[in-house]
Design a protein with these regions (language model features):
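Generic N-terminal amphipathic, Lys/Arg-enriched alpha-helix
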Residues: 15-34
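Active-site-proximal beta-alpha core segment in soluble small-molecule metabolic enzymes
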Residues: 60-154
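N-terminal glycine-rich anion-binding loops that anchor highly charged ligand groups
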Residues: 15-19, 38-69, 82
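Acidic, low-complexity proline/glycine-rich segments
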Residues: 2-21
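Short, surface-exposed alpha-helical recognition segments that flank or form part
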Residues: 34-37, 128
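A short, structure-level motif marking secondary-structure boundaries and short turns
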Residues: 30-32, 53-56, 72-75
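Bulky hydrophobic/aromatic packing residues
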Residues: 5, 20-24, 49, 79, ...
């Protein structure tokens, strides 16, 4: 258990190989545990199907919340990833994911200012978000700097 905890603490977002099985009680949680080969085969199968159907895709990262998996999805042709919240988008951007769509609309000035800070921190990335109200639009208009670039989906 100490080995697993030490690895997780030293590199909390890095893959950790479990070459030797460990008991569930020794597994640092929360943990995403999967068989990578099976995951990659499933991802490739879906990407190939969408390509044959002439469809693009932007998977939602809320199912895995893992930048490593998001990068694999990008490598397989994803246009980017979706994130539910600004904080989740920040993790993906920090990991180098070039395009993130925030799927939960914001309606407060404070959230819009947090979004503005994220836009300033990652100007080379594409950040998109959904908007569903005049209140949300007003919050963005009042909070974003003139040089901020944000794609909106209505």
């Amino acid at each position: 258990m100490e080995f697993a905890l030490g690895q997780a603490a030293a590199r909390p977002n890095a893959p950790m190989s479990l070459a030797q099985p460990i008991g569930l009680e020794a597994l640092p949680t929360p943990a995403l545990v999967l068989e990578r080969g099976a995951m990659e085969r499933n991802m490739r199968k879906m990407a190939d199907h969408l390509q044959r159907s002439d469809k693009g895709f932007r998977p939602h990262s809320k199912t895995h919340k893992c930048p490593t998996i998001a990068a694999l999805q990008m490598d397989m042709g994803a246009a980017g990833v979706c994130a539910a919240k600004i904080s989740e988008a920040a993790i993906m951007l920090a990991a180098g994911i070039p395009s993130v769509l925030i799927t939960s609309p914001i309606a407060t000035f404070a959230k819009a200012r947090a979004l503005n800070a994220l836009l300033a921190q990652y100007p080379e990335h594409q950040l998109l978000m959904v908007i569903d109200s005049d209140q949300g639009l007003a919050a963005l208009q009042n909070a974003l700097d003139a040089e901020s670039r944000l794609g909106l989906l209505v």
